[in-house]
């Protein structure tokens, strides 16, 4: 009898160890350790507010007691927006810090550089702060899912359709960074134009390290384009808007959403030079008076005041980081006490009609094992000299 009882205890103990072992590294009864890389310095430092926001949101969750009694320890490492540092810091997060997974790391090129490393080890690479279309390739990178934002390619489709509604014979110019980020814009326009692309579109590209795009802008203006789509990061976006203004060129002008920040891009170039500029939105804008009494906006402002006092509430990265972190928290809530990497990935790809307080009304987050695009709705906006004004209907991916 004692032998049977002892055997049962051994079996019970083995099962307990086995169950506990299912949880990912970095998960204890009191903590969930998460990692990310973020450019707090270097050429991508302008967007470090994303990391600030995500850390601040997790601090709020911890102050509220955490998730199922576990506090979130978000280790946010500075990669300087440099490929070699992204690789080094990611390896450190996994092999030294032993995080459960990565979340909210920034950059298309930088995250592509570590995607294979993470996927081979079946480590979730969640909600990358990038709208690259490739993050939806669930077959090639099943442990990678894109950001809480529309894909760049979807944004380009929206621009192209709007241009054609204004002028069926429009001549379209696209100025873009020669990377996955920029090429997604050309691909989106091609999706709309099909075999008419070559006859309708004039392309100009540049490298991330190029100090200027003035030459490309002059060439595009001389080609007779009536519409210009610019896909670039903020430093060159400032240059582009200024050069277009200096030339007296008046195309139907679209700036990618990444570079639509009023304080980061439009004010440095002079808001008077940006009137009529077009872009798209998917998140609530703190400058939009229609959200003044919105409960979600009020909660967000209270959070900013408490956790990020003195920061510029006009910077969209604080809203985007808030949305991304809220989505990550929902995944962890759905995961319950099964915090294995497999289940975390399963929950990240099973979000159903998730509404966030700082997404535009009507926009919901949906993912599935065969749909890795969390946000597939967006709306056109036009700059009026003070703020971005929404117009038209909410557009769904087609």
Describe each model-derived feature in a short phrase.
Residues 23, 31, 46-52, 63-137, ...:
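Beta-alpha junction/loop-to-helix N-cap segments that form part of ligand/metal-binding clefts
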Residues 24-31, 35-55, 77-84, 106-107, ...:
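Extracytoplasmic "Venus flytrap"
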Residues 67-78, 97-100, 197-205, 224-227, ...:
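A local structural motif
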Residues 86, 147-171, 211-214, 237, ...:
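Hydrophobic alpha-helical segments within soluble ligand-binding/sensing domains
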Residues 99-204, 253-279:
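Extracytoplasmic ligand/sensor domains, especially the bilobed periplasmic-binding protein
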């Amino acid at each position: 009898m004692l032998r049977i009882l002892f055997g049962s205890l051994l079996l019970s103990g083995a099962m307990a160890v086995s169950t506990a072992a299912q949880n990912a590294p970095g998960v204890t009864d009191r903590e969930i350790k998460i990692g990310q890389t973020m450019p707090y310095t270097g050429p991508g430092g302008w967007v470090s507010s994303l990391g600030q926001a995500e850390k601040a949101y997790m601090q709020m969750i911890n102050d509220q007691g955490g998730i199922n009694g576990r506090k979130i320890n978000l280790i946010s490492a500075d990669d300087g927006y440099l490929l070699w540092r992204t690789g080094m810091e990611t390896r450190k997060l996994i092999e030294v810090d032993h995080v459960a997974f990565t979340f909210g790391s920034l950059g298309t090129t930088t995250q592509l550089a570590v995607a294979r490393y993470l996927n081979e080890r079946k480590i979730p690479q969640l909600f990358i702060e990038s709208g690259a279309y490739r993050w939806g390739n669930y077959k090639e990178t099943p442990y990678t899912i894109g950001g809480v934002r529309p894909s760049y390619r979807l944004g380009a489709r929206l621009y192209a359709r709007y241009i054609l509604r204004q002028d069926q014979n429009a001549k379209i110019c696209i100025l873009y960074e020669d990377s996955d980020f920029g090429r997604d814009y050309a691909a989106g326009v091609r999706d709309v134009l099909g075999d008419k692309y070559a006859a309708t579109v004039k392309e100009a590209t540049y490298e991330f390290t190029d100090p200027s795009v003035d030459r490309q802008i002059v060439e595009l203006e001389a080609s007779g384009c009536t519409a210009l789509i610019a896909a670039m990061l903020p430093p060159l976006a400032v240059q582009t808007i200024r050069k277009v203004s200096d030339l007296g060129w008046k195309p139907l002008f679209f700036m990618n959403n990444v570079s639509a920040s009023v304080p980061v891009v439009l004010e440095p170039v002079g808001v008077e030079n940006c009137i009529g500029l077009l872009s798209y939105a998917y998140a609530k804008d703190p400058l939009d008076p229609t959200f003044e009494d919105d409960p979600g906006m009020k909660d967000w402002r209270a959070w900013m005041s408490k956790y990020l006092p003195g920061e510029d509430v006009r910077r969209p990265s604080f809203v985007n980081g808030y949305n991304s972190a809220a989505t990550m928290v929902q995944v962890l809530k759905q995961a319950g006490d099964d915090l294995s990497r497999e289940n975390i990935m399963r929950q990240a790809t099973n979000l159903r009609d998730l509404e966030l307080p700082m997404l535009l009304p009507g926009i919901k987050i949906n993912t599935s094992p065969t749909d890795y695009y969390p946000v597939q709705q967006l709306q056109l906006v036009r700059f009026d000299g003070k703020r971005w004004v929404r117009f038209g209907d909410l557009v769904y991916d087609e």
